[in-house]
Regions:
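Thiamine diphosphate
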Residues: 1-162
Length: 162
């Protein structure tokens, strides 16, 4: 397990997941990237929409190397933690809205695979049904989970109240 908390760098997680998955494959002597089947070991990534925008190009490498990964995009429409710390209504904490469901095909994944392995969830029920589909698939899987702009807990929630 790796975490961005070590470096406090939001753009760290997608490239780190690529590196960890490639390393895991090398240790386990997985299929070579030219194979028609994805690499067997897999990684699971939870990444915010703002962090993804800073390192999205690595999705192309994940697809190119046929990394078996499940990517959960936590879409809170911007810098949620920064809103709590530096001002909930500051415009610089907002980001452009992307069509994440098109990301796999945009970065070169097979169109049929992209359609079968791209999901969105706005409710717990939708997320539960998506999880069943994700478990039955392989290759790159992308799940966009929509959250509220100020969906915080604990001390961060207290900061928003002040």
């Amino acid at each position: 397990m790796i975490t961005a908390a070590t470096w406090l760098s939001i753009e760290y997680m997608l490239p780190a997941t690529l590196g960890a998955a490639l390393g895991q494959c090398e240790v386990r002597e997985c299929e070579v990237p030219q194979s028609s089947r994805p690499i067997t070991p897999y990684a699971i990534l939870f990444i915010g929409d703002e962090s993804l925008q800073m390192s999205i190009q690595e999705l192309g490498n994940i697809i190119r190397h046929r990394i078996n990964v499940i990517i959960f995009i936590i879409n809170s429409h911007g810098y949620t933690i920064e809103r709590a710390i530096h001002g909930r209504h500051q415009e610089y904490n907002d980001i452009a809205s992307w069509r994440h469901v098109q990301a796999l095909s945009f970065f070169g994944n097979d169109e049929d695979h992209a359609k079968r392995n791209t999901f969105a969830a706005t409710t717990w029920e939708e997320l539960e049904s998506v999880l069943d589909l994700v478990r039955k698939s392989d290759g790159v899987r992308l799940v966009e989970v929509f959250m509220g702009r100020e969906d915080n807990q604990g001390a961060l929630l207290d900061l928003l109240k002040n």
